UniProtKB/Swiss-Prot annotation:
GO MF term set: mRNA 3'-UTR AU-rich region binding; RNA endonuclease activity, producing 5'-phosphomonoesters
Role noted for this protein: Probable RNase involved in rRNA stability through maturation and/or degradation of precursor rRNAs. Binds to RNA in loop regions with AU-rich sequences.
The EC number(s) this enzyme carries: 3.1.26.-
Family membership: Belongs to the FAU-1 family.
Keywords of the record: Endonuclease, Hydrolase, Nuclease, RNA-binding, rRNA processing
Stated name of the protein: Probable ribonuclease FAU-1
UniProt enzyme class: hydrolase
UniProt xrefs under Pfam families: DUF402
Keyword Hydrolase among record annotations: yes
Keyword hit for Cell division: no
Length: 448
């Protein structure tokens, strides 16, 4: 199987993929140099790219290849893995069950963008353009999109290009569309990134085959039927421990400092290359140095959604980083039930070691109104405080503890490796976050 790998994990994942027997296609110049690879620009069976958090990868491609890659990744790195129930460009017969909603295969309801406005009760052919992942709603359009190695054909007219195709190649491919694909008429064509390496004849042959498929798909079928499978999609998220395993793999290829991938997620570039070259063991100090001034807390859901919370680092006290965050008035504190008034703020305590983050909420006068403990993977310090949410939370109000979101955790428990399952004993002892770190009892104002 052929894999194309891009992003900050490319060296480590290329080493693993080669060990697993995958062929590397369309490698970057740096990867060719590091592994002494022959240049193979044939289309991939599976593509691996960074997730937006830089703490995981999106795996997209032929279903068998995606499954094989992800399972080997589980064995080697032990990440959090979520697989989409539907594929990108699955073509199906759907029934419109509400305004902007279509029922797809297996009763899954997907959102239809407002510009299409299909009639409620109608049945037609749809294509998945964004698969549902976890609780995140998927998106389908009442178009037919058929995808090959080099091109996609669709019932939406126009000529489009992958953003990875340079301008010079776009000129060639646009000319090809005008001179050799004019018979497509009102159909649309999108040139995929692999098209820049393809001979014109190969592109034309594929377009002809896809056109014949599209004509057959337009005939439809029974509601709920999948007429054509697209590309499978999976998300693998790397917590701090998984990144350390990837550091070890990378170290077997090139000099790699401890914490390399965690620091890459902080956005470090040339200075990290220098640490790698010098072999300096400076991860803890570097992470602590970065966690000064303005910081962001990146709360990553297992299915890839990110909640970003901005704050100001108060300081490091022992093994705790304290962050002060202003709260936007008008809402209600989740799990605590107190309305957020103007001037409310949170003190967040982030451990150097541990699997939870403590948020204590305060009035403008400094009176604590409750504490919310998020159970998560071990946080990574820096200007971005990064962790993966394990979906279980504990709220303390008036000395009483409430466990939150257990049902959600049980629904997604299988996506977590065993080592990240929420620990027992999170309810005791009750703690709170103060300006100088963790305290055992919630602080009270003088008037309390």
């Amino acid at each position: 199987m052929k894999v194309r790998i891009r992003g900050i994990f490319a060296t480590a994942l290329t080493k693993l993929a080669l060990d697993w027997g995958f062929s590397i296609v369309q490698p970057t110049g740096k990867i060719v140099e590091r592994f002494d690879l022959p240049v193979d620009n044939s289309p991939p069976d599976v593509t691996v790219i960074d997730h937006e958090s830089k703490s995981g990868v999106v795996v997209l491609g032929k279903c068998g290849a995606v499954e094989a890659f992800v399972e080997r990744l589980r064995e080697a790195v032990d990440p959090v893995v979520v697989k989409a129930d539907l594929g990108v460009h699955d073509v199906f017969v759907g029934k419109v069950v509400g305004e902007g909603r279509v029922e797809g295969p297996g009763g899954i309801v997907l959102r239809v963008p407002p510009r299409f406005a299909p009639t409620v009760g109608s049945v037609g052919v749809f294509t998945v353009v964004r698969p549902p992942l976890g609780p995140v709603e998927g998106v389908a359009v009442p178009d037919i999109i058929v995808e090959g190695d080099y091109v996609e054909l669709s019932t939406s007219p126009g000529v489009r290009f992958s953003r990875h195709i340079p301008e010079g190649e776009r000129v060639r491919l646009r000319l090809l569309a005008e001179t050799r694909l004019g018979w497509l008429g009102g159909l649309g064509v999108r040139f995929k990134s692999s098209a820049r390496f393809a001979e014109d004849e190969a592109v034309v042959r594929e377009a002809e085959a896809l056109y014949r498929e599209l004509v057959e798909l337009a005939k439809g079928g029974e509601a709920g039927a999948v007429l054509r499978r697209g590309r499978c999609l999976a998300l693998a998220l790397f917590d701090k421990a998984a990144k350390e395993r990837l550091d070890e793999v990378r170290r077997s290829v090139v000099p790699t400092a401890r914490g390399h991938h965690a620091l890459r997620a902080q956005g470090l570039g040339k200075c990290l290359d220098l640490l790698d070259y010098l072999g300096v063991e400076a991860y803890e100090r570097a992470a602590e140095f970065l966690a000064r001034g303005a910081v962001e807390i990146w709360h990553i859901k297992p299915w890839g959604e990110m909640v970003k919370m901005r704050g100001e680092a108060v300081g490091v006290f022992g093994d705790w980083l304290v962050v002060k965050r202003p709260l936007r008035p008008g809402g209600v504190l989740d799990g605590i039930g107190v309305k957020i008034e103007r001037g409310f703020y949170a003190l967040t305590c982030v451990p150097r070691r541990g699997n939870y983050v403590v948020h204590t909420y305060y009035t403008p006068e400094g009176r604590a109104v409750g504490t919310y403990i998020n159970v998560n993977s071990e946080p990574e310090w820096g200007r971005r405080i990064i962790y993966i949410d394990l979906l279980v939370d504990v709220a303390y109000v008036g000395g009483e503890a409430k466990v939150l979101d257990l049902e959600e955790y049980r629904r997604y428990e299988d996506v977590f490796p065993a080592r990240l399952r929420p620990p027992s004993g999170v309810l005791s002892p009750p703690v709170a976050c103060g300006e100088r770190g963790i305290i055992e009892a919630p602080p009270q104002s003088a008037s309390s």
